[in-house]
Amino acid sequence: MAGHSKWANIQHRKGRQDERRGKIWTRLIKEITVAARMGGGDVAANPRLRLAVDKAADANMPKDNVTRAIQRGSGGLEGVNYEEIRYEGYGINGAAVLVDCMTDNRVRTVAEVRHAFAKFGGNMGTEGSVAFMFKHCGQFFFAPGTDEDKLMEAALEAGADDVTTDEEGGIEVICPPHDFSAVKDALTAAGFKAELAEVVMKPATETVFQGDDAIKMQKLLDALENLDDVQEIYTNAVIEG
């Protein structure tokens, strides 16, 4: 199944992640801590924790940091008690934005998120205002040149819902969030290495931004991204140019 080009956006996103590795480590420590607190410190029995630990390995985080975060979450070490909050809002031209946060101070966080939206041309929405435009799912991206037929066979057999190829040959695999680890293991066993593998909120439709609107939308996303309490940002805006 063909789709529009996403490969350049994936490469751009990976580049931005590399630039912000220190911030990514901080976010992963929070995620590991909360995952261990919610589901226990056994990686094999806690899919959310396993995903966070896998991300930490991909980000080259030292194992000692991972171990300490698990211990803090499971009660072995003292640590901050983080609360998970999701904010919804609108960007340029009404683009939908979800902002997932982990915070020890809800009042501070909501003020910072609201300020970022207002300063850069967006506005905060109410709960449920844009969340319905996204689907919770596992998402994998594979580089152009990957054997599409073999990947599709392995993915669908493992429980994937959909496999699409964009105009540059990049391949996206979508699966239910609870099947993410099983699909990842099956694809790895079949010899496929994903460029990105995450559980995400995927927009049902996307809006392409170019020119001045693209610049404005990127500034808003950057402002949100730079907030210490923000863990993940999801949007239906595709920035081009």
From Swiss-Prot:
A Pfam family: Transcrip_reg
Any one GO CC term of the record: cytosol
InterPro entries registered for this protein in UniProt: Integrase-like_N, TACO1_YebC-like_2nd/3rd_dom, TACO1_YebC_N, Transcrip_reg_TACO1-like, Transcrip_reg_TACO1-like_dom3, YebC-like
Gene Ontology annotations of biological process type: regulation of DNA-templated transcription
Location relative to the cell: Cytoplasm
Entry similarity comment: Belongs to the TACO1 family.
Record-linked PANTHER family: TRANSCRIPTIONAL REGULATORY PROTEIN YEBC-RELATED (PTHR12532:SF6), TRANSLATIONAL ACTIVATOR OF CYTOCHROME C OXIDASE 1 (PTHR12532)
The protein's name in its UniProt record: Probable transcriptional regulatory protein mma_0544
Natural source organism: Janthinobacterium sp. (strain Marseille)
Origin organism lineage: Bacteria, Pseudomonadati, Pseudomonadota, Betaproteobacteria, Burkholderiales
